[in-house]
Amino acid sequence: MYKKQIFCFVGETNSGKDTIVNKICEMDKRFSTVVSYTSRPKRDNETDGVEHHFVDSDTIKDIMDKRPDDVVAYTKISQDLSSSGYEYLATIDELDKGNIYIIDPHGIEYLRSKFGDIYEIIAIYIYTPLEIRRKRAKNRSDYTTEFAKRVENESVQFDHYYRHKKYDYIIYNIDGCLDAAVTTVYGLLTYIIGGGLRRECTSALGNIYTKKEIYDGLTYLKMIFTYYLNNFTSRTLILEDIQKKYEIMRNIILSHLK
């Protein structure tokens, strides 16, 4: 049974996940974000209906009360000790329109448990060290009690998420190079939608791989290993088990070229 793939991106505050996702959606129209509802104010560089649907808290409450079965995720983020915080909510109709969703770890588990029979939920964790995230916050003039509070709130949640390997893929953005991160994540996504990593383990059972799937696999490997050959002293973007995946995919490709 075919399931639509939903790529769920998770990462701590200022990890770069929003920038990575936005650049990928600009590069390739096969990818589009799930537009959630939020009660936070719209920023100057945002457009209603693009980044979010900007609504008030009453509208979000109304959706939750009248359409509870349509709610796929809900998050409330406190800004400081004196604030009631902002709310974020996503509905199943918005999930049907997009295939990339920026979400928190708890939201992924909820999606898998409630909608796993409808969607293939693929979790991608963007890991960026705290020092780099703190530097970004300072550069963007939002290094305030808000950032410190969010870091504190996220530490337990993401530590559990990381230690128990709730993700499918993890990108280590060690030195904070977003351009390289975009290249790697884009290669990974095109590889997956072409059938790549998710079907490697069944290749021995006689799966027939299309030219498109082989091309996507080669493209992904080329992008990853070209980067490493040109930047072999860097520790940026270490994809887990990449050498093993390379050998598996290489053997699959060679078998089709015989």
Predicted regions mapped to residue ranges:
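Small-molecule kinase domains that catalyze NTP-dependent phosphoryl transfer to phosphate-bearing small molecules
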Residues: D142-N231, L237-L239, Y246-M249
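Walker A/P-loop
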Residues: D18
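ATP-dependent small-molecule kinase phosphotransfer cores
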Residues: T38-G107
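Hydrophobic anchor at the beta1->P-loop junction of P-loop NTPases
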Residues: F9
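P-loop (Walker A) phosphate-binding loop of NTP-binding proteins
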Residues: E12
